[in-house]
Swiss-Prot record:
It comes from Nitrosomonas eutropha (strain DSM 101675 / C91 / Nm57). SUPFAM superfamilies: PRC-barrel domain, Translation proteins. Its main location: cytoplasm. Binds ribosomal protein uS19. The PRC barrel domain binds ribosomal protein uS19. One of its GO terms (cellular component) is cytoplasm. NCBIfam families: 16S_RimM. This is Ribosome maturation factor RimM. An accessory protein needed during the final step in the assembly of 30S ribosomal subunit, possibly for assembly of the head region. Essential for efficient processing of 16S rRNA. May be needed both before and after RbfA during the maturation of 16S rRNA. It has affinity for free ribosomal 30S subunits but not for 70S ribosomes. One of its GO terms (biological process) is rRNA processing. It is found in: Cytoplasm. Residues 95-168 form the PRC barrel domain. One of its GO terms (molecular function) is ribosome binding. Keywords: Chaperone, Cytoplasm, Ribosome biogenesis, rRNA processing.
Length: 168
């Protein structure tokens, strides 16, 4: 499964949900007629989105399976995913792009070749995306995923090169 969004809460009284999409285009999730929801990434529940509207950076979604606010409230925090087989196939070298889930576990080095850590996750801040890096000592560091910092993503060698010092 590839996670493409997160339910942030209910909307209205008819079972609609508010969703933060992790897709390049805000309405990219709506390209998929079937979604899988999970609160633990182990067991998945199939749902069918029937309509949506865009509200700022959020999607307001109607799901066929939910018709009241009480039931929809239980979905807060759940992840929205689709099977990888439903996503467009990308080149292995990453030149056509990559999915966030493919970056988890990749090594991060700076432009001097020094190992910084491994990608533990990514998240969106509104201003830009952020890499969550697991450092060798167990601590985490946040690195902005912007062109000025991320110099290269090499999917073949599973390495991201960043313009970042070890002591930032």
């Amino acid at each position: 499964m590839v996670v493409l969004g997160r339910v942030i809460g209910p909307h209205g009284i008819r079972g609609q949900i508010k969703v933060t999409p992790f897709t390049e285009h805000i309405d990219g999730l709506m390209e998929y007629p079937v979604w899988w929801l999970s609160n633990d990434e182990k067991s998945w529940q199939i749902v069918h989105p029937t309509s949506f509207s865009v509200h700022d950076s959020l999607l307001i979604i109607t799901l066929e399976e939910y018709s009241d606010r009480t039931n929809a409230s239980g979905l807060k925090g759940w992840l929205i995913a689709v099977p990888r087989s439903q996503l467009p196939q990308l080149s292995e070298d990453g030149k056509e792009g990559y999915y966030w889930s493919d970056l988890i576990g990749i090594s991060v080095v700076n432009t001097q070749g020094e190992f910084i850590g491994t990608v533990a996750g990514l998240f969106e801040t509104g201003a830009n995306d952020v890499l969550r890096i697991q450092l060798p000592g167990g601590k985490e560091e946040l690195i902005p995923f912007v062109d000025q910092v991320v110099r290269q993503v090499d999917m073949r060698s599973r390495q991201i090169m960043v313009d970042w010092e070890l002591d930032y």
